[in-house]
Amino acid sequence: MNYISIKDIDSLSKWVKSAIKIKKDPLKNKKLGKNKTLGMLFFNPSLRTRLSTQKAALNLGMNVMVMNFTNEGWTLEFEDGAVMNSGASEHIKEAAEVVSQYCDIIAIRAFAGLVDKEKDYQETVISGFLKYATVPIVNMESAIRHPLQSLADAITMEEFKPRHKDKPKVVLSWAPHPKALPQAVANSFVEMMQLQKDMDFVITHPEGYELSPEITKDCTIEYDQNKAFENADFVYVKNWSNFNDYGKVTNSDPNWTVTAEKMALTNNGKFMHC
């Protein structure tokens, strides 16, 4: 089984319940990964995802190997049929097969370039390893998804949701940022919320900052941030760059910054952020 999207799992509620049990006794399954190796390949930097994934593997008794392709390893070519006479030193076909020989699971982190939308949404790096690797692939944040983060968010909401409400209200709110940021975290949060049958979900952002319509299909969109925050139990705040004017910062309105006054509109809501 590959884990590329939160929708790859068979039951979100079952996975969340299992994760909460594991948190209470993280070394309970320390022999599960005996004689198995996790290979972690980083095409972009990481702090929390790297540490938490590596720690989880060690808790399961796995060996862990890490490669940072920013300053280690060869530059890879991902286009099939490409003539290897330019900057790339090795083709993904051979690289994925080699890594598969030494690893039982391959975890990959490769961000969006935020220049070519079509290329990013084709998930060039992840797709290349999926095609040629012979072992399971885990997504540690790709061009358009971050399913480990969204699973962790689902766990947090289960732990802190109000028990007196049948359907807690969750808001995903855009907020300004000086840099152009990927849509991966927001996309995966939306996909996770689409699996939550017992929660109300609203996305709020400035007009023109819609996420991919394929991702947000059937979601409630509210362009009035204050209205969206009313009676919310969770407010998840994240910036993402423009999807239509791809990768651009077309709005930096400070009025979209989340403040204590805005949180006062919520139902004593929990503030979440990645």
Regions found by a protein language model. Name each.
Residues 111-113, 176-178, 239-243:
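Short glycine-rich anion-binding loops that position phosphate/pyrophosphate groups of nucleotides
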Residues 215-274:
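Rossmann-like adenosine-cofactor binding region
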Residues 43-65, 158-238:
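Glycine-rich phosphate/diphosphate-binding loop of Rossmann-like nucleotide-binding domains
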Residues 133-135, 197-199, 264-272:
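A short helix->loop->beta-strand "cap" motif at the edges of active sites that frequently abuts
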Residues 31-39, 47-158:
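Phosphate/diphosphate ligand-binding glycine-rich loop within oxidoreductases
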Residues 32-38, 166-169, 268:
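Phosphate-coordination loops involved in phosphoryl transfer and adenosine-cofactor binding
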Residues 1-51, 55:
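Positively charged, low-complexity intrinsically disordered leader regions
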